[in-house]
Design a protein with these regions (language model features):
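Flavin-dependent oxidoreductase catalytic cores
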Residues: 1-408, 412, 416-423, 427-428, ...
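Short gly/ser/thr-rich secondary-structure transition/capping motifs
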Residues: 3-12, 43-45, 387-391, 468-475, ...
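Hydrophobic, well-ordered secondary-structure elements that form the walls
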Residues: 273, 304, 327, 339, ...
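Conserved beta-strand termini and adjacent loop/short-helix elements that scaffold enzyme active sites
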Residues: 315, 385, 474-476, 512, ...
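Short gly/pro/ser/thr-enriched loop/turn and capping motifs at secondary-structure boundaries
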Residues: 342-345, 436-438, 559-561, 666-668
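Rossmann-like dinucleotide/flavin-binding elements
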Residues: 402-431, 472-480, 484, 491-501, ...
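Rossmann-like dinucleotide-binding cores of NAD(P)H-dependent redox enzymes
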Residues: 427-467, 543-591
Length: 684
């Protein structure tokens, strides 16, 4: 079978190794002991199976997640060379079985970006020179010594040699990228050394230069060495990232220096530049949420490609084979890099080759199953693919006994339950009381930055058509209709929480679901007030602010964006967006009344002397602080205060083999709904 993506599926040489196609799996951290041996730093069989599954699916190059080579106990191949080589052969042989190649990524670790834990003390993870920690600015990471630098370089070379012995095809140096240690050395904003590793750009890159020279000396010139590389930093200041559309003064690496560094990395002997953008101070660039444009790094990476003669990879919300084919054909890049999309669908390579794009299960850039779980110290996985990282134990098998399964509700949880049961051979009926599938997710997917949510919804609808599932629309299930089924999934969703507030019977008050479902509520006037500073409320605020409205968020607690499972990358970008659009946030406050185009807001303020002058009215001082009333102009109010489970039918029929899932059990997020359905359905 031929493919229309002839450039994407053409071979390419990296150093002395030829890749079968131009699709590369990008490195993502795999730290849990179930996937990465805490002693040797070799991948366990579960960890290896995770990568092998992507090779099986048609990925040409696998680049593994970071493995430390720093002089510390455990997770260091150099300390256990024979054991490491033996364990790694299962991975390399498994990847080669499908014709793919594999590079193992080694890291000099995080420097100032270290999470300080009981296991990893701050003194173990030095920065180039004393500097404030990313996560706790009250802590200063110490400066690394020259003796330590020498040891790091030796360990990189020795670890690379072990990979070669284990049958690996190359290594990747982590990283002049994302504000990790080598990147901190490379950028003057972070590197304040005064010796030969600081000052000039040549000095700041000396560490990266000596690493590749040592690897080549140990493994031979033909042994491929890639480097993970962030072209631009997009840093406004410590812990302040720049948005794609804003003008700012770059504190990190700008594009001109990024091109210069790329040329120097090539001259040092690196065989491939694995490119993205960003830093820990602009974390939403290396880990782009749905608010980022698609292929957000391509415009910068293509400038690097013009300047070098080694293969260049581009990653970052880059999941469109049409765009990749065009970019490769036009010489803008050499290789399409994907991370999260391959977690969501490990068969991407084959589906791209065959042109089956509608069968691709999309990444929705939520970070809940991948980055979020990594930073909780848990296994890497995926919100829309529960089997990710558990390829063998979560693999679907044919059911020993075929059963009649009833699924009540056609939201994501209900459709996932129906899909899995049908794949396992059960007889499935799905009932949906409305005229559409998707439940509240239909409204959530409405904003233009949620295109992948809409793709996921379309994918589920296609599964319902392609699989032997009887779908009954516009039908509300009663207790009598549940008779005769062996297994029942109750996925009846949730009801929006309503507020009883004077004036809220106005047509100028809408709830989040209605506001999103209708696409865009037409508002006469410029002032919009959002009640509720959760994820949905803040995204609605963004939508209206982008239209030029003056937006105020009223939140009853002390924090906004306190959403279950929200990753730091998504949080940071949305907070920067709200700040950029000057969205006003009033915390510890409630709306008491809406009248005459104004909302009466009662705010509890502890620092009351600074607020008294801007208050219209004041209450008596209470034990928690002073209560201040504001009159906030509001031409329209959107209420976004969450949902309440709709478990009424479940309460009528609950018993053995009746499962309450999704928002009907607990309104949370996409991952919870899909995972709960999968984990039950895979075993019945």
């Amino acid at each position: 079978m031929s493919t229309k993506y002839t450039h994407l599926f053409s071979p390419i040489k990296v150093g002395g190794t030829e890749l079968p196609n131009r699709i590369a799996m990008m490195p993502m951290g795999v730290f849990s002991p179930r996937l990465l041996d805490p002693k040797t730093g070799a991948y366990t069989k579960d960890g290896a199976d995770y990568y092998i599954e992507r090779a099986k699916g048609g990925t040409g190059l696998i680049v593994t997640g970071v493995v430390p080579i720093i002089p510390m106990p455990g997770k260091n191949p150099v300390n256990f060379p024979d054991e490491y080589v033996e364990k790694m052969r299962y991975l390399t042989e498994g990847v080669h079985k499908y014709g793919s190649k594999i590079f193992i990524q080694f890291t000099a670790m995080t420097g100032r970006a270290a999470h300080i834990t009981n296991e990893i003390e701050w003194k173990m993870l030095p920065a180039p020179a004393p500097i404030q920690n990313v996560w706790d600015p009250t802590i200063q990471n110490r400066g690394i010594t020259k003796e330590e630098i020498k040891k790091y370089i030796e360990n990189f070379a020795q670890a690379a040699y072990l990979v070669k012995q284990a049958g690996g095809d190359g290594v990747e140096v982590h990283a002049v990228h994302e504000g990790y240690l080598l990147d901190q050395f490379a950028i003057s904003f972070y590197n304040k050394r005064t010796d030969e590793y600081g000052g000039s750009l040549e000095n700041r890159l000396r560490f990266a230069k000596e690493i590749v020279e040592a690897i080549k000396a140990k493994c031979g010139k033909e042994f491929p060495v890639s480097v993970r590389y962030s072209v631009r930093s997009y840093v406004k200041d410590f812990n302040r990232g720049a948005l794609p559309w804003e003008e700012f003064e770059e504190k990190g690496r700008d594009l001109a220096e990024g091109i210069q560094v790329a040329k120097m990395l090539e001259s040092f002997g690196y065989d491939m530049l694995d490119c993205d953008n960003g830093s820990y101070d602009s974390w939403f660039w290396p880990h782009p949420p749905m608010y980022m444009p698609k292929a957000c790094n391509l415009k910068d990476v293509q400038e690097v490609k013009k300047a070098v003669n080694i293969p260049v990879v581009c990653a970052g919300r880059f999941d469109d084979p049409e765009l990749a084919e065009q970019a490769i054909e036009e010489g803008k890049i050499d290789i399409m890099g994907m991370g999260r999309p391959l977690l969501a669908d490990p068969e991407l390579g084959h589906k791209f080759y065959e042109g089956r794009l509608e069968d691709v299960r999309p990444c929705i850039s939520c970070h809940q199953g991948c980055l979020g779980r990594i930073f909780q110290g848990r296994d890497i996985s995926c919100a829309v693919n529960p089997a990710c990282g558990r390829e063998k134990s979560y693999a679907l098998t044919e059911a020993e006994k075929k059963k009649k399964v009833l699924v009540i509700g056609g939201g994501l949880g209900g459709m996932e339950a129906a899909r899995v049961c049908a794949l396992r051979g059960h007889e499935v009926d799905l009932y949906e009381k409305t005229d559409h599938l998707g439940g509240v997710f239909v409204a959530a997917a409405t904003p233009d930055f949620k295109e992948d949510d809409r793709h996921l919804l379309a994918w589920y609808k296609k599964q319902m058509k392609d699989l032997p599932i009887q779908v009954h629309m516009n039908t509300e299930v009663t207790e009598d209709m549940t008779k005769g089924y062996d297994e029942i999934f109750v996925a009846t969703g949730a009801k929006e929480r309503k507020l009883e507030i004077p004036g809220f019977d106005s047509p100028h008050v809408t709830y989040a679901f209605e506001t999103l479902r209708d696409g865009s509520i037409q508002i006469d006037g410029e002032n919009v007030l959002i009640i509720g500073g959760g994820l949905t409320g803040c995204e609605i605020a963004y939508m209206f602010a982008r239209e030029g409205k003056k937006v105020t968020i009223v939140e009853m607690t002390e924090t906004i964006l306190n959403a279950f499972g929200l990753s730091a990358a998504n949080y940071n970008m949305l907070m920067e967006i709200l700040d950029y659009y000057k969205v006003k946030v009033i915390k510890n406050a409630v709306v008491e009344e809406f009248r005459d185009g104004k909302a009466i807001v009662a705010e509890t303020v502890k620092n009351y002397p600074n607020v008294a002058n801007r208050a219209k009215l004041m209450f008596a001082l209470g034990p928690q602080g002073m209560k201040v009333k504001h009159e906030i102009p509001a031409d329209h109010i959107v209420v976004s205060v969450g949902y309440l489970p709709d478990d009424r039918l479940y309460e009528q029929i609950k018993g053995d083999h009746v499962y309450l899932i999704g928002d009907a059990k607990r309104p949370t997020n996409v991952m919870d709904a899909i995972w709960a359905a999968y984990e039950i359905a895979k075993d019945i």
